[in-house]
């Protein structure tokens, strides 16, 4: 298997609309999740760069899409966090339409990393994203983030609950525990991204 050096990942650009990516070559893996799911922390942990993905002081405030270059033909797409309660309804609708259009129409998107706080998994919008991705034949890696908040035993219990709810989708969806703080699951995340890169490039 190809082993990529994620430490060399660099910021490419920010855009306000997914149609502005305007890059036809290579493959993309998108990171998506609620505003407080630990998305930025996961990208920083993956790349071993503390400030690559910037944190917003107000969750959900940033509506920009951030692109990061891993190799010349492999990009990470950091989609805006969703579910921010104070976001205007029109913004929420626009976001949902944009995401569905991206999942359905992007030729470069080959995988989706969906991040969920292990304490509050499978909220309504998480389930919507899973349905959208599966309908569009996009494979999913589901990270149960902040697992360090639980004891090892409770991690296993929560993992099993999520596993059972998604049991019928496990051919297209993989679930794993993750903690940016304790460095849990980072190597498995790299392995999955390497697998997608080798399979689809």
UniProtKB/Swiss-Prot annotation:
Which cellular components does GO assign to this protein?
cytosol
Keyword Magnesium present in the record's keywords: the answer is: yes
Q: Which cofactors go with this protein? A: Mg(2+)
Q: Name one GO molecular function term.
A: metal ion binding
UniProtKB keywords = Cell cycle, Cell division, GTP-binding, Magnesium, Metal-binding, Nucleotide-binding, Septation
Q: Which PROSITE patterns match?
A: G_ENGB
Q: Tell me the residue numbers annotated for binding GTP.
A: 33-40, 60-64, 78-81, 145-148, 178-180
InterPro entries associated with the record: G_ENGB_dom (IPR030393), GTP-bd (IPR006073), GTP-bd_ribosome_bio_YsxC (IPR019987), P-loop_NTPase (IPR027417)
* Residues where Mg(2+) binds: 40, 62
One GO biological process term is: division septum assembly
Q: Which residues form the EngB-type G domain?
A: 25-199
HAMAP family with a match to the protein in the record: GTPase_EngB
Q: What family does the Swiss-Prot or TrEMBL record give for this protein? A: Belongs to the TRAFAC class TrmE-Era-EngA-EngB-Septin-like GTPase superfamily. EngB GTPase family.
Main function: Necessary for normal cell division and for the maintenance of normal septation.
The protein's matches in PANTHER family, at most eight in alphabetical order, are given as: ENGB-TYPE G DOMAIN-CONTAINING PROTEIN, MSS1/TRME-RELATED GTP-BINDING PROTEIN
**What's this protein's name?**
Probable GTP-binding protein EngB
**Which gene is annotated as encoding this protein in its UniProt record?**
engB
